[in-house]
Structure formats: C-alpha cells, structure tokens
C-alpha cells in the first residue's frame, strides 16, 4: 500500500497505526491469516514460562514517551529494554565514478544506537550519598561519550547527536538486607518506589546541571 506498518504508532491524540492497520486488513490484495488474540497471548505466556522469551516491546508506549520524537522513531530495543533510542537507516545519496577508476560514495547517515551504561551498587552506598554519587556518575557517563572510540562513523555521529546514557542499579537485594526490609512486604514496595523515584530525580537533575555547563545535546 506504499507504506510500512512499522513506521507508525498510536498515541492518545493520533491513531495512525490503527488507521493504517485497518486499511491493510480490509485490502483484499493483502493476504493473511486471522489469529485470536487470546491464542497468541497463551503462546507468548507458555514460551515465557518455558524459555524466558519473547521479550515484549510496547512500541506505542515507548514512542509516546520518547523525548526525541521530533528527531526520529524508536523501532526496537535490546533484550533488557533499557536502551530506547531513535533508529534510522543509512541511505546511499550519490555514487561518483572517478577518472582513475575508483568509486566514491556519499551517504545520508542514519541513527545507529550506542550504549553507554553505568550502575550504582546499592549495597555499598547510603541514601545520604546517593545524590552526590549519581551526579558524579552522570558526568562520567557523559565523558565516556566524548572519549569512547566508536567502531563505525554512524555510531560516533549518533552518540554525539543524542549523547544518550543509561544509569542503572546493582546490589538491590543487598540494599534490602542492609535495611532489614522483607521481600515483597508493604515496606518493600514503599521503599522501592521512593528509592527509584529519587534515583530518577537525581539523574535528571544532574543531567540538567550538566546541560547548563556544557549546553544541550545537538538533537535537543
């Protein structure tokens, strides 16, 4: 029909994917089979129990929350789903045959996702140290982008364009033991909610302060 369904997603304001999906569904020139949603869900659940896969990616939700939707679209993620960035294809723009017989190609560079990650060891840090350490880690991760050696030009350009980083955690069970918190208790749920809200807040705050110092990333 002249378009690919994977290039669209639904939001509260726009149902572009649903609209085009229904168009395809009603097109007699497109052949397919009808699968009950419940049967599909049963297969997914059985596979998840037996193998741990597949990993479910809710593209509508991810793209609706994408802070860089003005610059592209998120098509997929890695298995753990902590990397959610715009993806774009590199296309051939021009091919020049030189007099010496060599060929020069020019391309329009797409977005090639890069992964710059770090973790807080929750079992070895106090709540009072959290904000200071996160600020340091955010700065370190940003510096990694600058000094890292990318294997291909597209990944270098994408790193510089978005300056995307990921700050995660390790030692979560250690943290709970240190604070005498029983697993899946009401206290556990409350503490987890507060802890990770603080981590998110301190991370965004540190990123904001860094932007004041160094400027916003080019695709902002």
Positions of predicted regions on the chain:
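Active-site-proximal structural scaffolding
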Residues: 33, 37-40, 49, 110-115, ...
């Amino acid at each position: 029909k002249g378009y690919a369904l994977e290039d669209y997603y639904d939001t509260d304001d726009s149902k572009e994917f649903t609209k085009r999906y229904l168009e395809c569904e009603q097109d007699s020139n497109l052949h397919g089979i009808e699968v009950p949603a419940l049967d599909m869900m049963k297969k997914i659940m059985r596979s998840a129990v037996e193998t741990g896969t597949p990993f479910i990616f809710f593209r509508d939700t991810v793209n609706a929350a994408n802070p860089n939707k003005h610059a592209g679209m998120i098509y997929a993620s890695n298995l753990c789903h902590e990397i959610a960035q715009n993806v774009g294809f590199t296309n051939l723009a021009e091919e020049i045959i030189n007099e010496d017989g060599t060929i020069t190609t020019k391309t329009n560079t797409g977005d090639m996702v890069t992964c710059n990650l770090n973790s807080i060891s929750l079992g070895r840090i106090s709540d009072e140290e959290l904000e200071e350490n996160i600020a340091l880690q955010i700065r370190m991760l940003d510096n990694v982008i600058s000094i890292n050696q990318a294997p291909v030009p597209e990944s270098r350009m994408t790193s510089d364009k978005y300056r995307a980083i990921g700050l995660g955690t390790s030692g979560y069970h250690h943290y709970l033991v240190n604070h005498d918190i029983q697993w899946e208790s009401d206290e556990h749920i409350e503490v987890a909610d507060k802890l990770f809200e603080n981590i998110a807040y301190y991370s965004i705050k540190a990123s904001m302060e860094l932007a004041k110092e160094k400027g916003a990333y080019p695709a902002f």
